[in-house]
């Protein structure tokens, strides 16, 4: 083995493995481990998983979840939910000819001050008129915005990823035109409450 190869191997051995844990809202489930020379190097890393990996329900395999490492408790890395996305294959499977696809992208604020960008999706049974699309898009926006304002961030994300909010949209929008499916296609956290960020930073420093 070359001296260079040996040095690389030795450097890898110097790394320590840290366990990555989901937030309490997602059951504090292990997302696996990540290596680092120092635990502070893990802060900011993004981890991807699926809802199926957390629940064991294969019907949820198309729901991709994203978490960001924000601190630590000993050797356990604390994460925050930062968004979700439905798989492209799943979305393609929903598309039908001679039907309308209605998207709406907008920002909402939860009861505890998180700002989240939401992409809603509704698919109709047949082609609908522009006025009906506008009415359905309004329902998407109003339903999601109202729910966000009433719920904490943790509760809102549960409503989103488990499909309950999409079901509410479906029930309201089907009164405008026959529907095939409603989904929250994607979310992304744009802003967290300022005081929360300071608390996380303090926790990370004291636990390091």
From Swiss-Prot:
Domain of life: Archaea
GO molecular function terms attached to this record: structural constituent of ribosome
A GO CC term attached to the entry: ribonucleoprotein complex
Any GO BP annotation: translation
Keywords: Ribonucleoprotein, Ribosomal protein
Family statement drawn from the similarity comment of this UniProt entry: Belongs to the eukaryotic ribosomal protein eS1 family.
Protein name according to UniProt: Small ribosomal subunit protein eS1
Taxonomic lineage from the root: Archaea, Thermoproteota, Thermoprotei, Sulfolobales, Sulfolobaceae
């Amino acid at each position: 083995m070359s001296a260079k190869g040996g040095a690389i191997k030795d450097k890898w051995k110097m790394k320590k493995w840290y366990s990555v844990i989901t937030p309490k809202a997602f059951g504090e489930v292990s997302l696996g481990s990540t290596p680092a020379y120092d635990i502070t190097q893990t802060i900011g890393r993004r981890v991807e998983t699926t809802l199926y990996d957390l629940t064991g329900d294969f019907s949820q395999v198309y729901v991709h979840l994203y978490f960001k490492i924000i601190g630590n408790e000993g050797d356990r890395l604390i994460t925050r939910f930062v968004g979700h996305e439905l798989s492209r294959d799943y979305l393609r499977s929903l598309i039908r000819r001679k039907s309308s696809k209605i998207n709406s992208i907008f920002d909402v604020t939860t009861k505890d001050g998180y700002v989240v960008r939401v992409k809603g999706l509704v698919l109709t049974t047949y082609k609908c008129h522009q006025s009906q699309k506008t009415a359905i898009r309004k329902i998407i926006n109003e339903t999601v915005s109202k729910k966000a304002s009433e719920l904490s961030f943790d509760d809102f994300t549960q409503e989103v990823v488990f499909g309950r909010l999409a079901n509410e949209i479906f029930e309201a929008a089907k009164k405008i035109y026959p529907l095939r499916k409603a989904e929250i296609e994607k979310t992304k956290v744009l802003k967290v409450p300022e005081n929360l960020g300071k608390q996380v930073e303090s926790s990370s420093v004291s636990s390091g």
